[in-house]
Design a protein with these regions (language model features):
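Charged, low-complexity terminal tails
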Residues: 1-133
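Conserved, carboxylate-rich catalytic/transport cores that coordinate ions
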Residues: 104-532
């Protein structure tokens, strides 16, 4: 190009960088510049790995794209970027080059100070962030100390990130500090607004006479949850009818009665989206006075509910349903172990016995339908007084857990049918059919284990057959993760595309409005129809 002087080359470098910032050019990790094109560029979230490499998880839900260590030098875990697929490996997995960082999402960082030659550096305690970070201060003389620092310059391919220490935390990190850091990194607000707390403080701790809905108070409803549960948003009652079928009542806390749309509490709940659970600590979606108080279906206390009243045939099919507002007084709060053991002599014993008979029929039908059933063990973590993991066990899944899952599934299916039949603009829980390329790779992997999968796009019944074969093998529960990873990710959508994993034509979330905003949205939709 005839650039003979250092000054000319430096000027060109600055000009090229400016053109990249303005979107006129793109540049990759090898400093190759090109004309921007939307063709082949994939937007998504960067996920770091402890070995320095990473992946881009595309916003569109397609397969992850591997990013080598060099491509990760200019980004942190959690950043948003544009990637172009450069090649595929022998297993047809894509490898990409980072074209542009669209958004840096790390503003503060928790790390350990160390001295490298003549410079203070920070090593993140987050194993997904492996990049070197320069500390801008001098004279700290605190090697090995854990600190909280503010990122003052984000990483790039030309320079390392820099930070400024804001808080000295000691030589070890407490659980409270880790939780606070996680909340900060994921932008999860811990405190509710003054307006939200003020509006909930005005609510009475008991049902107002004007809200009285007495028709269901005589029914022996029960809640069944984990032993450590604090908020009870669902209760059930079941009876056998004269046709040898069942009537199942699923009563869900009527959160929408207390939280008007666009109110301060509603805005705070929308920001959170869900309740967030940490060891020994919960960040609730709703203020505690609602989530653990007025909306929680505590035994012996009148509570407003939205009821899904379901008729189920003797062969386990839903024949009819209706939604209505009600009020219940829960008879008993049971743990899963208590419900599994059963107390037939109790006032609610007959209802629980009927529910168990119903669920036995539902499980038979579920198996015939071909719904996927992953037998992945759930870890049971025990913590010491300092909040550190002291032991790891395995939770046992008993029949009471299945009972509640199937009852809630019935209510969710009915809610989806309600939305569909009335052509409402509601949120469906969609699980689309798997990608054919992923199925091709899965079929090759299963074949190496002598597990067969039919050609073409397999049905859920086909995949369940493969799961059953894997579970008979050594480390079968680990091997079945290959099938899980080959499936599409479930999502919320205004368009109903069915639920592949459950093998049903429509599904939504209705049963957890205390801790999940999408369920809250479904409640509002159903109540708007009931009240009109």
């Amino acid at each position: 190009m005839g650039l003979d002087s250092v000054h000319q080359r430096q000027a060109l470098k600055y000009r090229l960088r400016a053109m990249v910032r303005e979107g006129q050019l793109t540049v990759d990790g090898r400093n190759f510049y090109g004309i921007p094109s939307n063709t082949g560029l994939i937007k998504g979230r960067i996920v770091g790995h402890s070995n320095g490499s990473g992946v881009l998880t595309p916003d569109e839900g397609t397969e992850d794209i591997f990013l080598p260590r060099k491509e990760m030098e200019g980004v942190f875990d959690g950043d948003t970027g544009l990637v172009r697929i450069l090649r595929r490996d022998r297993r047809n997995r894509p490898e990409g080059g980072l074209i542009e960082v669209l958004q840096h999402n790390t503003e503060t960082i928790l790390g350990r100070l160390y001295f490298d030659k003549s410079t203070w550096m920070l090593k993140s305690v987050n194993p997904r962030i492996t990049q070197k970070i320069i500390v801008s201060q001098s004279g700290l003389e605190k090697e090995g100390l854990i600190v909280r620092a503010k990122i003052t310059r984000q990483p790039s391919f030309e320079s390392m990130a820099t930070c400024r220490v804001e808080e000295l935390l000691g030589h070890s990190v407490s659980t409270d500090i880790k939780i606070a850091e996680s909340l900060r990194n994921n932008e999860i607000p811990e405190l509710f607004s003054k307006e939200a707390l003020s509006s909930t403080a005005k609510l009475e701790n008991q049902i107002m006479s004007s809200d009285f809905r007495g028709a269901l108070r005589a029914y022996p409803f029960i809640t069944i949850d984990g032993a450590d549960a604090k908020d009870f948003d669902d209760a059930i009652y079941c009876e056998q009818d004269s046709d040898h079928g069942w009537r199942l009542l699923v009563a869900i806390a009527d959160v929408a009665h207390y939280v008007p749309e666009d109110s301060p509490v509603d805005k705070n709940a929308f920001e959170r989206g869900t309740s967030v659970y940490f060891p020994g600590k919960v960040i609730p979606m709703l203020p505690i006075s609602l989530s653990n108080g007025l909306c929680s279906l505590k035994p012996g206390e009148d509570r407003l509910v939205l009821v899904c009243d379901i008729r189920i045939s003797k062969v386990g099919t839903i024949t009819d349903y209706k939604f209505y507002e009600g009020m219940i007084c829960s008879t008993e709060r049971l743990t899963y172990d208590q419900a599994s053991n059963g107390f037939i002599a109790k006032p609610w014993g007959e209802s629980l016995s009927s529910a168990k008979n119903l669920v036995a029929k539902l499980l038979v039908r579920r198996k015939k339908r071909g719904a996927l059933d992953f037998e992945t063990p759930e870890p049971d973590l025990n913590f010491d007084a300092d909040g550190r993991i002291s032991a790891v066990g395995q939770k046992t899944r008993n029949d009471a857990m299945q009972l509640i899952e199937e009852c809630m599934l019935c209510a969710n299916v009915c809610a989806a049918r309600f939305i569909d039949e009335l052509k409402l603009k509601g949120l469906y829980r969609v699980h689309e059919r798997p990608d054919e390329k992923k199925m091709f790779g899965l079929r090759k992997f299963l074949s190496s284990l002598n597990v067969t999968l039919p050609e073409g796009l397999p049905s859920p019944i086909d995949l369940q057959g493969a799961l059953n074969q894997l579970n008979k093998k050594l480390n079968g529960q680990v091997l079945q993760l290959a099938i899980l990873r080959s499936l599409s990710q479930a999502k919320y959508d205004l368009r109903n595309a069915g639920h592949y994993g459950l093998n049903i034509s429509m599904y939504t979330h209705f049963t957890s409005p205390i801790r999940r905003y999408t369920d809250f949205v479904t409640h509002r939709l159903i109540k708007s129809v009931i009240q009109s």
